[in-house]
Curated annotation (Swiss-Prot):
It holds the Pfam family peroxidase. This is Manganese peroxidase H3. Its main location: secreted. Glycans are attached at N100, N155. The lineage of its organism: Eukaryota, Fungi, Dikarya, Basidiomycota, Agaricomycotina.
Length: 380
């Protein structure tokens, strides 16, 4: 569609400020050739992360670390003074402070899981560990882009300021202003970053339910999130006891297979005149999901100077290939359930999944009810 083409053009026009020039190419101990010898340290870290935490799965441990990369980076402010915050690993360096901010509820699991890696791979800074771990986690999610990774962030000595992380109950105006203050993010970049909600689940929005997914394919980096947030809500997967949640189109829950939870902020961004057409433009446009990479390229260096960092993107593992399944209306939903606020662009023609009843969203990527997960004890 024409709108998708224009958005792809915006992705292509992303800033191309270079990192520090690579030094002489090097061969790492395992035989991998890299553009800078400093990148070799991340190869055993990637292997350690996959074997110890992720098991090459786009599961809960991967989801939580991807969330950590965002929460660590966005806590910086141009208006309040960027003396602290940004993508600096301060979540790991101050585990008894930042994880206790209300917006970071539940992030202690990923913080505690990464602290041992900071100790074991002690030549790598906390900020590098957070962003590299997020890049590795994302490679386990089919369809995800291979993120840029720049190394040699210094360790910070003070924690970030509280109150800088957007929350699901925030208004669209508040969210857009927060992103602008953090790093001059455009509305398109904000929506692009929310592509990560395609592989996300919530434990703390409604604490009566566990690992509530935001779409029906939480283990695949696809565009279902952008379609399903546009559908009419009919109920709640849990008890609706907290702020930040609105009715979901697919709330059916059975045992550990939790129904879809809809964030109030996603609902609002999909319907606001400033972002509705951007949101709608992502539906069934898998190529546009690559804009997440461009937006993360910017987010991952907030508070840093790109020209002092080293490009180690060549040690980020190759992601799993896309599933290549077009977006579709889940069973029991259809075009009649769309709540569209963008009237200037045509909506794509999509198929409807067969079934007279709502299909349960599996708790685990293999369809099982019990998933292997890692949880280390720690200070957070």
């Amino acid at each position: 569609m024409a709108f998708a083409s224009s958005l792809l053009a915006l992705v292509a026009l992303a800033a191309v400020t270079s990192a520090a020039p690579a030094t002489t190419q090097a061969t790492c101990p395992d035989g991998t050739k890299v553009n800078n010898a400093a990148c070799c340290a991340f190869i055993p870290l990637a292997q350690d992360l996959q074997e110890t935490i992720f098991q090459n799965d786009c599961g809960e441990d991967a989801h939580e670390v991807i969330r950590l990369t965002f929460h660590d980076a966005i806590a910086i402010s141009q208006s309040k003074g960027p003396s602290a915050g940004g993508a600096d690993g301060s979540m790991l360096l101050f585990p008894t402070i930042e994880p206790n901010f209300s917006a970071n509820n539940g992030i202690d699991d990923s913080v505690n899981n990464l602290i041992p890696f900071m100790q074991k791979h002690n030549t790598i800074s906390a900020g590098d560990i957070v962003q590299f771990t997020g890049a590795v986690a994302l490679t386990n999610c089919p369809g995800a882009p291979q993120l840029e990774f720049l190394a040699r962030r210094p360790n910070k000595t003070i924690p970030a300021i509280d109150g800088l992380i957007p929350e699901p109950q925030d208004s669209v105006t508040s969210i857009l202003e927060r992103f602008k203050d953090a790093g001059n993010f455009s509305p398109f970049e904000v929506v692009s970053l929310l592509a990560s909600h395609s592989v996300a689940r919530a434990d703390k929005v409604d604490e009566t339910i566990d690992a509530a997914p935001f779409d029906t394919t939480p283990f695949v980096f696809d565009t279902q999130i952008f379609l399903e947030v546009l559908l009419k809500g009919v109920g709640f997967p849990g008890t609706r006891t907290t702020r930040g949640e609105v009715a979901s189109p697919l709330p059916l829950t059975s045992g550990s297979d939790t129904g879809e939870l809809r964030l109030q902020s996603d609902f609002a961004l999909a319907r606001d005149e400033r972002t509705a057409c951007i949101w709608q433009g992502f539906v069934n446009e898998q190529a546009l999901m690559a804009s997440f990479k461009a937006a993360m390229r910017k987010l991952a260096v907030l508070g840093q100077h790109r020209n002092t960092l080293i490009d180690c993107s060549d040690v980020v593992p190759a992601p799993k290939p896309a599933v290549n399944k077009p977006a579709s209306f889940p069973a029991t939903t259809g075009p009649q359930d769309l709540e569209l606020s963008c009237n200037t662009k045509p909506f794509p023609s999509l198929s409807v999944d067969a079934g007279a009843q709502q299909t349960l969203i599996p708790h685990c990527s293999d369809g099982d009810m019990t998933c292997q997960s890692v949880q280390f004890n720690g200070p957070a």
